[in-house]
């Protein structure tokens, strides 16, 4: 059972019971797209006669997401650490994600999140939030190089971003694809999609994929990252604009 804390971090707001109920329902809706049998549903937590009950008949005081529990050792991040992930797993994930992205929703609102304006806003926010870590986890030279490179790319590739929008490549994606959100068990479960902020999941499918590819490279598995990218391109039919962006 998963309960949301009544917190407000700016990018997420769970401060009212109604908001927590809504985001519990969104979490189930979004994650059933990739692992329906892992997300069982949303249940009220009630209080009566001095006792809390899950699914009771009293007035709800909280809501919870009921999920199927899987063993932590089946996490892809753990299996990578033990050297248990091979190219077949990459092929399977590529097939799953290409199909998922093909079926994911898109509309005029979602497409707008692929605009230069919003992409730049996301990057500027990222740079603002990481500025305080200069000299601690990133050097000033590295920080400025990354910022300059990103801003130059955005200025130079306006037509590329417009093409991706017109080609309907901006979708309601997962938003947090990395090896810690994938179970390799009786089958592949890709879970924990972002429910609390549209701006994190309304994105180019290339951005969704890039997060997982980057994670594999960070874990020193460039071979698996390259395999996943190659197979995703094969299965999805994406062209040169996908690789360029």
Task: Give, region by region, the residue ranges found by the protein language model.
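Conserved ATP-binding subdomain of kinase catalytic cores across diverse folds
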Residues: 1-174, 179-245
């Amino acid at each position: 059972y998963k309960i949301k804390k009544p917190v407000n971090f700016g990018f997420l707001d769970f401060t009212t019971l109604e908001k927590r109920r809504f985001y519990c329902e969104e979490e189930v809706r979004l994650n059933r797209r990739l692992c329906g049998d892992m997300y069982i549903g949303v249940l009220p937590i009630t209080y009566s006669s001095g006792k809390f009950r899950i699914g009771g008949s009293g007035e709800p005081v909280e809501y919870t997401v009921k999920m199927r529990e899987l063993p932590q050792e089946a996490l892809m991040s753990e299996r990578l650490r033990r050297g248990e992930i091979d190219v077949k797993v990459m092929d399977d994930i590529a097939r799953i994600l290409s199909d998922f992205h093909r079926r994911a929703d898109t509309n005029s609102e979602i497409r707008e999140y692929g605009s230069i304006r919003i992409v730049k806003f996301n990057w500027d926010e990222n740079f603002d939030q990481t500025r305080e870590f200069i000299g601690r986890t990133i050097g000033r030279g590295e920080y400025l190089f990354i910022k300059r490179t990103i801003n130059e790319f955005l200025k130079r590739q306006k037509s590329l971003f417009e093409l991706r929008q017109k080609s309907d490549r901006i979708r309601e994606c997962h938003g947090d694809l990395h090896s810690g959100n994938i179970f390799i068990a009786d089958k592949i479960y890709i879970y924990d999609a972002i429910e609390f902020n549209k701006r994190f999941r309304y994105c180019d499918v290339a951005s969704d994929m890039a997060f997982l590819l980057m994670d594999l490279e960070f874990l020193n598995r460039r071979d698996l990252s390259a395999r996943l990218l190659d197979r995703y391109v094969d299965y999805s039919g994406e062209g040169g604009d996908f690789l360029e962006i």
